[in-house]
Design a protein with these regions (language model features):
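Preference for long, amphipathic alpha-helical scaffolds in soluble/luminal domains
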Residues: 1-213
Length: 213
């Protein structure tokens, strides 16, 4: 029996289709998750070692501009541009309908770094002030801030990963120059992650279980 063979050229062709032409129709329902789709497409080409070869500097700059167009003025990134009211029409009342999300923010950061951007246009302080507002009392993180600043969605380890990754990219190990910006509660986050560990030495994706004896 012949083993499976990785078809690199076919993968490259698929990613380029997603990047430069219309997305497959099965992705239509995921329009609000375009940042996620962009991440997997660009990261896929980068992992295959052809991102620089198969895209021009002008194209890569265009992708960077699209990412920044998804940046929310109060910090973080939205999943796509469809909820953007524009600077003149955005108000504290309607901002709840155009929220930044933790996954989109993390993916935006990684895409920008992959494309060679210096992150100088990222609203660093605003994003780092927004991040702790999404942390729950148990240490986990939500997805977005809803009406009244209520934390919505998330709660599992994926969102913990997105939050920690975003924090590291923007704050670094020491947080130099950001001493006046409130940090997330790292000990609580660690406790939540540890509480998700089960006796089989794996981690449950959702809520914590009883601590290991």
């Amino acid at each position: 029996m012949t083993g499976a063979v990785f078809n690199k050229e076919r993968h490259i062709k698929y990613y380029l289709r997603c990047l430069k032409t219309f997305l497959p129709d099965l992705y239509t329902a995921n329009d609000s998750n375009r940042m996620l789709l962009a991440f997997f497409t660009i990261a896929g080409l980068d992992v295959l070692g052809v991102l620089q070869e198969k895209t021009t500097p002008e194209e890569r700059q265009g992708y960077i501009e699209w990412i920044y167009h998804c940046q929310v003025p109060t910090g973080g990134f939205r999943g796509f541009t469809g909820t953007d009211f524009g600077q003149e029409r955005r108000t504290p009342e309607n901002a709840v309908w155009d929220p930044a999300s933790i996954p989109s923010t993390f993916f935006a950061m990684v895409i920008l770094v992959t494309l060679g951007d210096d992150l100088s246009r990222v609203k660093r302080s605003e994003c780092l002030r927004w991040l702790p507002r999404l942390q729950r009392a148990d240490g986990s993180f939500g997805d977005i801030l809803g009406p009244g600043g209520e934390i919505e969605g998330g709660r599992d380890l994926r969102f913990c990963c997105f939050a920690a990754g975003t924090r590291y990219i923007l704050r670094g190990r020491r947080g130099q120059g950001l001493e006046d910006v409130k940090d997330i509660d790292v000990p609580r986050l660690v406790s939540f992650i540890e509480a998700c560990q089960v006796r089989a030495a794996n981690f449950l994706p959702m809520s914590p279980v009883h601590p290991i004896d």
